[in-house]
């Protein structure tokens, strides 16, 4: 029985890893839409990256998963030399176009885990709403590519509870339960800012980096039905749905936005930044 259990656990791990690899590649299928609708990050976040990381003026930055350059452009505008590693070839093509005015930026197509990168070559590693796709087995590589006193800055836009949404995200749960019950789960409402999980726990446990300093930057976005559905169409789990199920789900959501929320909803976000020095 013990051997059977180990076999089942190995099979589950392999399935989880295969699903992770499948989902993280989905964004390239909608690269143009991703570029059009994915949000950036508050200006204050970039100011704090500089202050907390100690990255020098004109310093060398490695960005993991640049997408189409949502976070790259503000860093390029600050004069840093940036090497971007992006898994999706279509995303990388758009990123190169968006960053064409900045010869200090290079966009490579590849996965961080396997991309050949020089050791001790960067002052800062950054990743914007992408680091959760990195395989933990490659965490030591983060430390190897950094210079002494180098740092890592990881940040995400997170959807949190807020009175500004008028209860919309509670109201759409029956639509998810009807059309995509595997997404609904046990809905207990959106988390508050204080209830968000620590995205750096696994990395911190390696001991490769010093204690993380955390910055939080709340902001809101407003969407009509089409804009909100476009946003959903850039989420890997929605992209993985069969087209007919996704369409029924989206029809139900659009009908609620237009019929019960006056054609517009507001979404409360918080950008969360984690910065630590390499040890």
Short names for language-model regions:
Residues 4, 68, 189-279:
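Conserved Class I S-adenosyl-L-methionine
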Residues 2-57:
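Conserved class I S-adenosyl-L-methionine
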Residues 58-59, 120:
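Nucleotide donor/acceptor-binding cores
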């Amino acid at each position: 029985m013990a051997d059977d259990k180990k076999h089942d656990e190995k099979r589950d791990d392999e399935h989880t890893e295969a699903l992770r690899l499948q989902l993280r590649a989905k964004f390239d299928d909608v690269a143009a839409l991703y570029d059009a609708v994915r949000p950036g990050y508050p200006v204050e976040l970039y100011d704090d990256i500089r202050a907390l990381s100690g990255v020098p003026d004109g310093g060398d930055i490695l960005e993991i998963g640049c997408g189409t350059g949502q976070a790259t452009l503000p860093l390029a505008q600050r004069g840093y030399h940036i090497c971007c590693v992006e898994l999706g070839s279509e995303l990388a093509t758009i990123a190169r176009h968006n960053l064409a005015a900045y010869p200090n930026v290079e966009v490579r197509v590849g996965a961080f885990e396997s991309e050949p990168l020089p050791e001790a070559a960067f002052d800062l590693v950054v990743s914007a709403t992408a680091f959760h796709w990195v395989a933990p087995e490659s965490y030591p590589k983060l430390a190897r590519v950094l210079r002494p006193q180098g740092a890592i800055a990881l940040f995400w836009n997170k959807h949190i509870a807020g009175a500004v949404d008028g209860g919309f995200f509670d109201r759409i749960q029956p639509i998810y339960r009807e059309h995509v019950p595997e997404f609904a789960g046990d809905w207990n409402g959106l988390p508050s800012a204080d209830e968000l999980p620590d995205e750096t726990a696994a990395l911190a446990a390696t001991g490769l980096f010093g204690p993380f300093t955390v910055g939080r930057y709340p902001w809101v976005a407003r969407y009509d039905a089409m804009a909100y559905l476009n946003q959903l169409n850039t989420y890997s789990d929605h992209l993985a749905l069969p087209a007919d199920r996704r369409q029924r789900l989206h029809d139900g959501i659009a009908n609620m936005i237009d019929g019960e929320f006056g054609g517009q909803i507001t979404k409360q976000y918080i950008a969360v930044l984690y910065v630590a020095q390499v040890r």
